[in-house]
UniProtKB/Swiss-Prot annotation:
Belongs to the TPP enzyme family. MenD subfamily. It holds the Pfam family TPP_enzyme_C. It comes from Salmonella choleraesuis (strain SC-B67). Homodimer. NCBIfam families: menD (TIGR00173). This is 2-succinyl-5-enolpyruvyl-6-hydroxy-3-cyclohexene-1-carboxylate synthase. The gene is menD. Its cofactor is Mg(2+); Mn(2+); thiamine diphosphate. GO terms for biological process: menaquinone biosynthetic process.
């Protein structure tokens, strides 16, 4: 009997089972213990293969692929700390709903807790963060293939959102020629190999329950809060809110077109808050809200009813309002709860939104971070997509820009970390083959610098704008101790990214004014390659501009 041959047949069943659940992208890191899984994936023509030498980046690459494809994405890594490096992406997927299938190779049980090399306690190591966890036994012909395939099917059928961790122990030898070992075991699955359906088909329907009193509530004074959603959903939500005559507070990830722009500015005005207090119901569609003033208002508003609608399970309301938590796809929920044409009830808020927008426009000529956030709409590629980083940049875009309705926008706003942002953006581009604009800060770029290797393989123009304000300038917005701010919070690195781009053979520009930026972008959008554009800006100007605008708008 050949152990290596049977390992591969066992792995082939696992990988083939994944194809029956929509898995097309497989992300693979190098490793020896994962050889059975890697070879099974490599030999399966149903898969598109992606490779990366860094498991943390690999997990985020898969996250980006899943965001756009809306299908589960598989990740294959070897044993040991390689597995632990998947933790950040797994956590993010659990909070934002992307389906990741983490296939982690492992040592067999007799090599755990005995000093064996690269052997750690992997089973259950991710605690409660995966939505589903499956610890497979060591491959053996004593276990029928139908058990293995039905176990995979069951786990995937139960996976509504988030990650499935499948721990896969393999004994040595891991290498060797294929022979007939396990062939009969594998063939007992019969014509399943030629079929395209799961061995075990389980139905888990997610249906939106119609709220019987909706016809009552839609006649009241309401507010619509739009969080993270798809581009198609964003356009529908904008039309729905307009028909109802309810003000729409749109997050940067809502893709609603933010009909009342600069919400994070005018929500700091007492007149706006007073008018919103008249709302009898708040309907929040989507989660992961960005704006600080929006979150502050959400925490203090007290409507008669607060409804949260999202495809992801859980409360999703840090303010713990009295109301309803409805698990449903946003588009399906809107269809069941049609709007009734009514006149807008808010008067002050549209006026304040227009005045806030005018204040922002008045400062657009200065070459700086806040102005880039405002201008970002002008730089979006046609028929393309936008990936927004975390920390200060996403807050500036949320507060100062107005993105087109239905234009695809992606970000990692679940745990809102700055790790893996370049890798996620690379996955977003690969899944769509669209021209992509990504914008991150300098520390975010440094954190995921080796992901520039992924940008050597793009299928359409990709522009990475690195806003270099020399450190974590978001802390300039917080009451951090002045004497300790630079060393312990901002941590300026005093670096530039030209050598990093050159190391990975990427195009690079460092414009010093808007004309040079626009010229660099024009050239980049004509080339199916990646371009790094570094904007070196005054370190505190972005944060100070935001604070100045907040003060101005609060007194309108």
């Amino acid at each position: 009997m050949s152990v290596s041959a049977f390992n591969r047949r066992w792995a082939a069943v696992i990988l083939e089972a994944l194809t029956r659940h929509g898995v097309r992208h497989v992300c693979i890191a190098p490793g020896s213990r994962s050889t059975p899984l890697t070879l099974a994936a490599a030999e399966n023509p149903a898969f598109i293969h992606h490779t990366h030498f860094d498991e943390r980046g690999l997990g985020h690459l898969a996250l980006g692929l899943a965001k756009v494809s809306q299908q589960p994405v598989a990740v294959i890594v070897t044993s040991g700390t390689a597995v632990a490096n998947l933790y950040p992406a797994l956590i993010e997927a659990g909070l934002t709903g992307e389906k990741l299938i983490l296939l982690t190779a492992d040592r067999p049980p007799e090599l755990i807790d005995c000093g064996a090399n690269q052997a750690i306690r992997q089973a259950g190591m991710f605690a409660s963060h995966p939505s589903q966890t499956l610890s497979l036994p060591r491959p053996t012909q004593d276990i029928p293939a139908r058990w293995l395939v039905s176990t995979i099917d069951n786990a995937l059928a139960m996976l509504h959102a988030g990650a499935l961790h499948i721990n896969c122990p393999f004994a040595e030898p891991l290498y060797g020629d294929m022979n007939d070992t396990g062939l009969v075991w594998q063939q007992r699955l019969g014509d399943w190999w030629q079929d395209e359906k799961p061995w075990l088909r389980e139905a888990r329907r997610l249906e939106s329950d119609k709220q019987r009193d909706w016809f009552f509530w839609r006649q009241k004074r309401g507010v619509v809060v739009a969080g993270r959603m798809s581009a198609e959903e964003g356009k529908k939500v904008a039309q729905w809110a307009q028909t109802l005559g309810w003000p729409l507070i749109g997050d940067v990830l809502s893709q609603t077109g933010q009909p009342l722009p600069c919400a994070d500015l005018w929500l700091g005005n007492a007149k706006a808050v007073t008018e919103l207090q008249q709302a009898q119901i708040v309907v929040q569609l989507g989660s992961s809200l960005t704006g600080k003033r929006l979150l502050q208002w959400q925490a203090t508003c007290e409507p008669e009813e607060y409804w949260v609608i999202d495809n992801i399970e859980g409360r999703l309301d840090p303010a713990h309002h009295r109301g309803r938590r409805l698990v449903a796809k946003i588009a399906d929920w809107l269809e069941l709860h049609p709007a009734e044409k009514r006149k807008p009830w808010c008067v002050e808020i549209p006026r304040l939104a227009e005045l806030a927008w005018q204040r922002v426009v008045a400062q657009r000529d200065t070459f700086g971070e806040a102005q880039l956030a405002h201008r970002i709409r002008d730089y979006l590629p046609e028929q393309g997509q936008l990936f927004v980083g975390n920390s200060l940049v996403v807050r500036l875009i949320d507060a100062l820009s107005q993105l087109p309705a239905g234009y695809p926008v992606y970000s990692n706003r679940g745990a809102s970390g700055i790790d893996g942002l370049l890798s996620t953006a690379a996955g977003v581009q690969r899944a769509s083959a669209k021209s992509t604009l990504a914008i991150v800060g300098d520390l975010s770029a440094l954190y995921d610098l080796n992901a520039l290797a992924l940008l050597r393989q793009v299928s359409a123009p990709f522009v990475l704008i690195v806003v270099n304000n020399n450190g974590g300038q978001i802390f300039s917005l917080l009451p951090t101790p002045q004497s300790k701010r630079e060393r312990f919070y901002l941590m300026p690195q005093n670096v530039h990214f030209d050598h990093a781009a050159a190391m990975f053979n990427l195009r690079y520009h460092r414009p010093e004014n808007w004309e040079e930026l626009e010229s660099a972008l024009a050239g980049a959008w004509r080339t199916p390659a990646a371009t790094v554009i570094e904007l070196v800006v005054n370190d505190t100007d972005g944060a100070q501009t935001l604070q100045q605008l907040l003060a101005q708008v609060s007194h309108l």
